[in-house]
Regions:
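Charged helix-capping and loop-helix junction motifs
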Residues: 197-201, 229-234, 371
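Active-site neighborhoods of metal-dependent hydrolases
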Residues: 137-194, 236-240, 244-245, 249-388
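Divalent-metal coordination cores built from histidine and acidic residues
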Residues: 66-72, 86-185, 274
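Alpha-helix-loop-beta-strand connector modules within alpha/beta enzyme cores
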Residues: 120-125, 200-215, 241
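Hydrophobic faces of well-ordered beta-strands that scaffold small-molecule active sites
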Residues: 75-81, 100-102, 125-129, 184-186, ...
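Active-site microenvironment of metallo-dependent hydrolases
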Residues: 4-7, 17-42, 47, 56, ...
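Active-site-adjacent beta->alpha loops and helix N-cap segments on the catalytic face
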Residues: 107-112, 193-202
Length: 480
């Protein structure tokens, strides 16, 4: 009798697995988790927005998605996304992104931003506190409605701040951190009036809360003094003396041909215990505002670019000096695409293991729609310079680990493990690709077959499901 019971237990054990029914089961996909190194055919059980089971055994679910022949990975996390309109969110979802955050220069009113997005977001969202906005307020300058960046020639962009103005900025940033900001965002190239001391004082605000600083460095080209090397050294130094963690954004465009040298500085800082991280996007052209301080006199010598390297995104028009002067002096913010790098340089950047992926996404540039699928198509499938595991790590786990300095909620993102949030991308490695171009920047990527945000299916069979808004806010420590 004892042996019979034992035999029955062995025979029925697979059935016990099936007795647990999940809200949704992803069946038979190649499951990849960059933290544990899992790369195997598995079934994934999801309930109540969480991954509850990953098993080689069959699982039962009220809904089953067949993922045979497909990759099942953690949803991609974009730490550098400007556009938050619904169309941009759709493009992000079709690019495999489950979380997109405005971390570079932040939002001017964090509470208002979070309230405006609640219940209306396809994907997860969040923001830093904006130093450019705090600076504009300290100088009594209205914050531009179409851009947080102060216009070239204004006091908020060009003038050094008084001690009183620096204190006003710090108070504003603390207020925004209290409202749920995930750190401090700075755009130093757009505010050349910022002194080295002001930089350190802003880093101190982040360090008070053990939060990171995300910064666009001054990016002044190869010329000394003030080169890209000096720009990166400046913010690493501020991190060292204050203890704030630091994320340097889009090193591909900020440092150009000097990107590898700048990456060596970052590697050296990390080897000595500093929390310095870095991201990039896989395109040779940048995009910014033409009436910003980035185009102050001397910009051509610093960047190595010409007027003809500037293109209006809406028309494809290449600029002349006369057209540049007209647009630069306009009171209306206008975006411009700047062809100032090469894909050869960009490719080298992404081979570096320190570099994670972020889009710097904004309408009118293909990076808004295609960044993440482009990584898979270009570097994994076409060039073979990244393994699939490494590419997924750069797009999920690495940004999640940066976010862990801002919010414990990030510990459950960027992983495909039991207990993690069910933010999941399912894609076809043979067909996944970006389709957006400089001429047609709104073309969605293809190859993402399914996307889950918090367990809710947002993309099904390559099509966005309309009318569902599962995105949730990620907020800083002080808000919880």
């Amino acid at each position: 009798m004892k042996n019979l019971v034992l035999c029955l237990a062995v025979v029925l054990s697979p059935l016990s697995m099936l007795s647990q029914s999940y809200d949704l089961v992803i069946q038979g996909g190649r499951v990849i988790d960059p933290e544990t190194g899992l790369d195997a055919i598995r079934n994934v059980g999801i309930s109540q927005g969480k991954i509850r089971k990953i098993s080689a055994e069959a699982l039962a679910g009220r809904r089953v998605i067949s993922a045979q022949g497909l990759i099942v990975a953690p949803g991609f996390i974009d730490l550098h996304q400007h556009a938050v309109d619904l169309e941009s969110q759709r493009l992000k979802a079709l690019d495999g992104v489950t979380t997109a955050l405005e971390m570079e220069i932040g939002k001017p009113d964090v509470a208002a931003f979070l309230q405006s997005m609640e219940g209306h977001s396809l994907i997860n969202y969040g923001t830093t506190a904006s130093h450019p906005a705090a600076r504009s307020l300290a100088f009594g300058t209205p914050i531009p409605t179409n851009s947080l960046l102060p216009k070239s020639g204004t006091a908020a962009a060009e003038k050094p701040a008084s001690p009183e103005q620096i204190e006003a900025m710090k108070a504003r940033l603390r207020h925004e951190l209290d409202a749920g900001a995930l750190g401090v965002g700075m755009g130093l190239q757009y505010t050349p009036g910022v002194t080295r001391w002001e930089v350190i004082e802003m880093f101190r605000v982040a360090a008070e809360r053990s939060l990171p600083v995300f910064t666009h460095v001054r990016s002044n080209g190869k010329l000394e003094p003030g080169s890209n090397i000096e720009s990166v050294s400046e913010v690493i130094g501020a991190a060292a003396v204050t203890g704030a963690a630091l994320q340097i954004v889009h090193i591909n465009s900020s440092c150009g041909a000097q990107a590898l040298d700048c990456l060596s500085l970052i590697a050296g800082a990390r080897a000595r215990g500093l929390a310095v991280t870095v991201e990039a996007y896989p395109y040779e052209a940048a995009m910014t505002y033409i009436n910003s301080a980035r185009f102050n006199p001397g910009w051509q010598e610093k960047s190595g670019a010409t007027y003809h390297d500037l293109m209006l995104p809406e028309t494809g028009e290449r600029l002349t000096k006369e057209r540049f002067d007209e647009l630069h002096n306009s009171s209306e913010p206008r975006t411009i695409i700047l062809f100032s790098n090469t894909m050869e340089n960009v490719d080298l950047v992404f081979r570096n293991p320190l570099v994670m992926v972020a889009s710097d996404g904004e309408k009118d540039h293909p990076r808004n729609a295609g960044t993440f699928c482009r990584i898979l198509a270009r570097y994994v499938r076409s060039q073979g310079t990244l393994t699939l595991m490494d590419a997924i790590r750069k797009m999920s786990l690495m940004p999640a680990q940066v976010l862990e300095r801002s919010t414990p909620a990030a510990r459950f993102k960027g992983r495909l493990q039991e207990g993690a949030d069910a933010d999941v991308v399912i894609f076809n490695l043979q067909t996944v690709t970006d389709r957006a171009t400089y001429q047609h920047p709104q073309e969605p990527s293809q190859g993402v077959e399914y996307l889950l945000v918090g367990g809710a299916v947002l993309v099904e069979k390559g099509k966005l499901i309309e009318g569902t808004f599962p995105g949730k806010a990620l907020v800083g420590e002080m808000k919880r």
